[in-house]
């Protein structure tokens, strides 16, 4: 297993000042000033020109090209941007400190332009600079610089991608984030499942467990420094906490019977999970500081897959208390639960694996009915149900940090195995997420740059 200390977030990079530093000579735009507007539900991607990041010296050329490629791929995969082929460029940028000739970029129908530079500093660090231009108005929308160790150049590319996304859409991006998932290798009857973690675009895969025991349902803590998951080892399955920085793990409550479907509270102080007792399962929450446990449901049914609302006041969960698996919502401290899943076109449909959006506006779910497994979203009151994608076996949705994209896994059956896919909440731009092998049970981390002080 890789040295977990080498992947801790706090060592990734150093930003100038107390946060994101504006470049000298750049223009800082006030929140209310004009900027490009992109409706995330709009079907026409915005044409954007992304020039190669200039090298500060000949030895910086490869990393500059790498940063350019990562930014291009991020924006293209979002579905909101259409990067223009560099072969169409009329102007070749040679100095990012000089305003471009905007007519050259209008001619190739670019609405936005990204320029940048990568320079190795005397102390060995990399300095990354970028500019974002509104080609139509001729305004500079953003200009910032970052310093980082050379090995973390990809992270800089993701952060720049987020800055471009936010400046053009008015919403936070999601590129500077990770995904934890279950990596699957070997024949189906002897499948080895390991806990794995990667960047949201599939790069930098790291294996966190050796595969000697079966692992399921990994979930990030709010500060992205811990993962909770279920493991089938000696005896009953147990819920574990894994510390990414130290590589250490511990059992979350040594309960008799099986514990499963763990998830952190939004403040990271508690873990909610399902505990099997006889033929039924109920929801429990454990305070991670005091290790005290509170029972939230007490029914003869199977209550599982709990997920907190972003403000921590409510939970959604899956229960078969009405005879079929459906989604319910109740107060985080327990009490009466309200069913919110009611299929209008298939009264026999079942709902499972609910998860609350970080924005609080939707609950994503898996719906089974008519021989199909669908990934969908609905509002927390059950209204506005929308199926985004359907197939033989789609399951386990997880939201991006900005709540605009879902990742899930699809298993085609047969002798093969599952793969990860993403789709936006309007149901378009479905993409396969690259992984080394078969993969299931994805969970998206919060935006790493937003958790730097936690």
Swiss-Prot record:
The gene is tolB. GO terms for biological process: cell division; protein import. PANTHER family: PROTEIN TOLB (PTHR36842:SF1), PROTEIN TOLB HOMOLOG (PTHR36842). This is Tol-Pal system protein TolB. The keyword Coiled coil does not apply. The lineage of its organism: Bacteria, Pseudomonadati, Pseudomonadota, Alphaproteobacteria, Hyphomicrobiales. The Tol-Pal system is composed of five core proteins: the inner membrane proteins TolA, TolQ and TolR, the periplasmic protein TolB and the outer membrane protein Pal. They form a network linking the inner and outer membranes and the peptidoglycan layer. SUPFAM superfamilies: TolB, N-terminal domain, Tricorn protease N-terminal domain. Disulfide bonds: none annotated. It comes from Bradyrhizobium diazoefficiens (strain JCM 10833 / BCRC 13528 / IAM 13628 / NBRC 14792 / USDA 110). Keywords: Cell cycle, Cell division, Periplasm, Signal. Pfam families: PD40, TolB_N. Belongs to the TolB family. InterPro entries: 6-blade_b-propeller_TolB-like, PD40, TAT_signal, Tol-Pal_TolB, TolB_N. Part of the Tol-Pal system, which plays a role in outer membrane invagination during cell division and is important for maintaining outer membrane integrity. Residues 1-30 form the signal peptide.
């Amino acid at each position: 297993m890789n040295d977990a200390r080498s992947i801790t977030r706090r060592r990734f990079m150093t930003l100038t000042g107390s946060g994101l530093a504006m470049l000298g000579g750049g223009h800082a735009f006030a929140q209310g000033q004009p900027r490009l507007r992109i409706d995330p539900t709009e079907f026409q991607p915005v044409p954007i020109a992304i020039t190669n990041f200039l090298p500060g010296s000949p030895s910086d050329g490869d990393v500059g090209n790498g940063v350019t490629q990562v930014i291009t791929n991020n924006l293209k995969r979002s579905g909101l941007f259409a990067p223009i082929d560099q072969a169409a460029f009329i102007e070749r940028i040679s100095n990012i400190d000089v305003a471009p000739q905007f007519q050259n970029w209008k001619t190739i129908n670019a609405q936005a332009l990204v320029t940048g530079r990568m320079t190795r500093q005397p102390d060995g660090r990399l300095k990354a600079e970028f500019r974002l231009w509104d080609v139509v108005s001729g305004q500079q929308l953003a200009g910032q610089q970052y310093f980082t160790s050379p090995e973390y150049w990809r992270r800089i590319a993701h952060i720049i991608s987020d800055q471009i996304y936010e400046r053009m859409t008015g919403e936070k991006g999601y590129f500077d984030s990770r995904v934890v998932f279950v990596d699957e290798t070997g024949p189906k009857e002897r499948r080895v499942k390991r806990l794995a973690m990667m960047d949201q675009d599939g790069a930098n895969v790291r294996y966190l467990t050796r595969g000697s025991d079966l692992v399921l349902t990994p979930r990030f803590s709010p500060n992205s420094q811990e993962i909770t998951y279920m493991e089938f080892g000696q005896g009953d399955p147990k819920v574990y906490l894994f510390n990414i920085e130290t590589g250490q793990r511990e059992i979350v409550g040594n309960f008799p019977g099986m514990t499963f479907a763990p998830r952190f509270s939004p403040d990271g102080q508690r873990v909610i999970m399902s505990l099997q007792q006889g033929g039924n399962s109920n929801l429990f929450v454990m305070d991670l500081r005091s290790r005290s446990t509170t029972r939230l449901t007490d029914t003869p049914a199977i209550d599982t897959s709990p997920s907190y609302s972003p403000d921590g006041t409510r939970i959604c969960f899956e229960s078969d208390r009405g005879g079929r698996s459906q989604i319910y919502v109740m107060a985080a401290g327990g009490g009466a639960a309200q069913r919110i899943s009611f299929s209008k076109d298939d009264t026999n449909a079942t709902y499972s694996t609910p998860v609350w959006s970080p924005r609080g506006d939707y609950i994503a779910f898996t719906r089974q009915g008519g021989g199909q497994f669908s990934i969908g979203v609905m509002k927390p009151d059950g209204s506005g149900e929308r199926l985004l994608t359907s197939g033989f076996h789609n399951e386990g949705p997880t939201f991006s940090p900005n709540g605009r994209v879902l990742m899930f896994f699809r298993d085609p059956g047969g002798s093969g195995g599952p793969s990860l896919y993403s789709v936006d909440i309007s149901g378009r731009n479905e993409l396969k997420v690259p992984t080394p092998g078969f993969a299931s049970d994805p969970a998206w981390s919060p935006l790493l740059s937003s958790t730097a002080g936690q």
